[in-house]
C-alpha cells in the first residue's frame, strides 16, 4: 500500500500540486514536498512547501540560501512537530537541564549548529532580492533560448512561478 507521495520541485519548477494534493486527500496518504531546489517558487499563488503535510528545504552550499550545509523540515501536525524536535537532538528537548530530562525516544543529531544558523539568518534580509535575480535570469534565458533552433525550454504550468534554482532545457 502506498504510504506517501514524495514530489521534487526540480530546478525550482513547482510540480502540479493541485493534482497531487487531490490524490493524497482522496487516498488518505501523506504528501511530502522536496523543496530543496524551489525556495521562493509559488504554485497557484501559494509558496512551495505549504501544500504538503511535510516539506523539506535544503540550505546546502550552492542553494538559493545557504548555511553551508543543513536544511529545514516543516510539517502541519503540531504533535509530530514536537516529536521531530525531540528526535533531532538525541531524543532530548533542547533547553532542559540534563537532570530533568525524560528521554522517551532514541534520537539522532540532526540539529543545525549555531554558526550555520547565523550564516542562514544573515541572508534572510536579502533573500527576496536574491531569488528575484534568479527568476529574472531564468526568464531572460527562457526568452533568448526559445528562439534558438534545436533547443526547447522547460514548459511552465500556468499555476507555477518557478524560482529557477538551476536552468534546464531540452535539446
Model-derived segments and their meaning:
Residues 1-67, 72-74, 78-79:
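Active-site phosphate-binding strand-loop segment of PLP-dependent enzymes
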Amino acid at each position: 500500500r502506498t504510504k506517501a507521495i514524495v514530489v521534487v520541485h526540480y530546478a525550482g519548477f513547482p510540480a502540479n500540486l493541485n493534482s497531487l494534493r487531490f490524490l493524497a486527500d482522496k487516498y488518505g496518504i501523506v504528501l511530502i514536498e522536496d523543496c530543496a531546489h524551489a525556495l521562493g517558487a509559488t504554485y497557484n499563488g501559494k509558496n512551495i512547501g505549504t501544500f504538503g503535510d511535510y516539506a523539506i528545504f535544503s540550505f546546502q552550499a550552492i542553494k538559493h540560501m545557504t548555511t553551508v550545509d543543513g536544511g529545514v523540515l516543516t510539517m502541519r501536525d503540531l504533535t509530530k512537530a514536537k516529536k521531530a524536535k525531540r528526535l533531532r537532538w538525541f531524543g532530548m528537548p533542547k533547553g532542559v537541564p540534563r537532570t530533568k530530562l525524560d528521554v522517551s525516544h532514541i534520537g539522532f543529531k540532526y540539529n543545525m549548529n549555531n554558526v550555520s544558523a547565523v550564516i542562514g539568518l544573515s541572508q534572510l534580509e536579502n533573500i527576496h532580492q536574491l531569488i528575484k535575480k534568479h527568476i529574472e535570469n531564468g526568464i531572460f534565458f527562457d526568452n533568448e533560448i526559445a528562439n534558438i533552433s534545436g533547443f526547447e525550454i522547460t514548459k511552465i504550468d500556468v499555476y507555477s512561478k518557478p524560482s529557477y534554482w538551476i536552468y534546464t532545457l531540452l535539446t
